[in-house]
Design a protein with these regions (language model features):
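Charged, glycine-rich intrinsically disordered N-terminal tails and low-complexity linkers that flank
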Residues: 1-69
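Residues that form generic nucleotide/phosphate-binding pockets
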Residues: 27, 39-43, 77, 175, ...
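Nucleic-acid nuclease catalytic cores
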Residues: 59-61, 65, 76-183
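Long, amphipathic alpha-helical segments that form or neighbor coiled-coils/leucine zippers used
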Residues: 187-215
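Contiguous, amphipathic alpha-helical segments that mediate oligomerization or scaffolding
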Residues: 207-232
Length: 232
């Protein structure tokens, strides 16, 4: 297990003061609901005191309500006790990156992250966005393993295991560092979606074709693979 640094000073008061695990999927281009540009804009507005929180919807409220039950069901099905719920960890190298883990359990004598999820979808493998979030948590905690119990479609319960992937963690953390730099400098990351271009250039698209989100994801993955091969 890595030598980690847990927060010794008061944890951040608001989302504008740090990059959390919920931001990881956006930073690596795996959040279909938000782009890095939109995330930076939100963080900047929070820091400026001009941001208005959107109203929660039924699914969001259900997720918050069901989260503790998912952790309890994980313990019921696996026999593993979940401790340290909502514990805060800070990344050992980047003080502006941290995470609140849903819980911590002890597996074969070593601590592991527990990240609960509820979804109306069914998937045989964890979506890449969740993997990015969990790898960010593993990078912050220094743990080598995470369990992701998922309550699917209101009737199915499945527990996924995610092992630490240092190379992918570096990719995720570096992307978060990039976005945070834009937040502090009050600049914006490169536009990645049609909405980004519309927000940035509302009156002029210049006649250029925009890459699809899927194409952008593929380019991001190719860059990561190229870096991984170079470092190997």
């Amino acid at each position: 297990m890595k030598n980690i640094v847990e927060l010794q000073i008061p944890e951040p008061k608001g989302r504008g003061d740090y990059m959390g695990s919920g931001d990881a999927s956006t930073c690596v281009g795996e959040n279909k609901y938000q782009s890095p540009q939109q995330l930076a804009t939100v963080k900047q507005a929070i820091r400026a005191g001009t941001y208005q929180e959107p109203q929660s919807n039924t699914l969001m409220r259900f997720g918050s309500f069901a989260g503790p039950w998912v952790l309890d069901e994980f313990s019921e099905q696996t026999g593993q006790v979940v401790m340290d719920r909502e514990k805060w960890f800070r990344h050992p190298e980047h003080p502006f990156i941290g995470c609140h883990v849903d819980g911590v359990t002890i597996h074969k004598g070593i601590p592991a992250v527990v990240e609960s999820k509820t979804t109306s979808l069914y998937y045989s493998e964890l979506p890449q966005g969740i993997i990015a979030q969990v790898q960010q948590q593993l990078a912050c905690t220094g743990y080598e393993l995470a369990f992701v119990p998922v309550f699917r479609q209101g009737r199915d319960f499945h527990v996924y295991e995610v092992e630490a992937d240092p190379m992918y963690q570096d990719f995720v953390i570096n992307k978060m560092v990039e976005v945070w730099g834009h937040v502090l400098n009050e600049t914006l990351p490169p536009p990645m979606t049609p909405d980004d271009f519309k927000e940035r250039y509302p009156d002029d698209f210049g006649g250029e074709a925009l890459a699809s989100r899927e194409a952008v994801r593929m380019v991001e993955k190719l860059h990561w693979l190229k870096d991984a091969i170079t470092k190997a």
